[in-house]
Amino acid sequence: MTLKNVKPDLDAAFKALEVYAEAKQHILRESTEITNETKASIGASISASTASDKKRQELLRDAETHAEKAGKILVQLQKRLKEDYGKFWRQDLISSAIFAIPEQEIVEAFALLSVLKQTEFPSRIINFRTQDPGSYLKTKTTLKVSNGAYIFGLLDCVGELSRVIEKSLDQPEFAVQTFTTMQELFGELERFTEFPNRKDPKMEKDRKSAGETESHPKAFSNLKHRIDVCRNQVLKCRKLLGNHTKLS
């Protein structure tokens, strides 16, 4: 008996796992940059909702710039993974929370920005522009995200819209308009309660970090829970607006 059939396959398996580990480390590094840019974008969008006209436009430009930077990093990351890892990189890596989270955050940032700018929501194929190195020109770029990242990113956007509404109660017309969009978006997402066990990567990561506690039960991160949270946010905003406007 010899190991001639074992060694080649074990060598190949070791190499595959080595490449996988390197790819995950690269994703982790880039994900931090994406998170920083999306947080900056969302923060600017939220601030724009209560700013005067001139300041509002300035903040929306900042929000767009940060969202575009995040998108550019992810496009470059996807390209790098395809080149280094191979054509099955998405199949093997997309289930990893560390990859799903940056996609989700980018959807959230671009979706919120679209509401504030009163433009169409982004599709799963997000169109944006990237700054050309050493130039003032921008190039049209597209980014495709996974189904899960798209759904959870839009659910996150519902949550951000509730923040916008709470800060905009002294602008009743804008607040009601934003609520109408929020309600319509949630109406499209509510059907996904049919798939209750899909996990929100961001919430799952938080749950694992906190440990299995009463405040972070196992169901905390599933899709049904996220939809229930958004439903409560819609109802809360409806009540708030009912107290401040003629919304019925």
PLM feature segments, named:
Residues 170-248:
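Long amphipathic all-alpha helical oligomerization modules
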Residues 59-140:
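Long, charged all-alpha helical bundle/coiled-coil segments in cytosolic proteins
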Residues 19-33, 51, 55-62, 94-101, ...:
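Non-transmembrane, amphipathic alpha-helical segments
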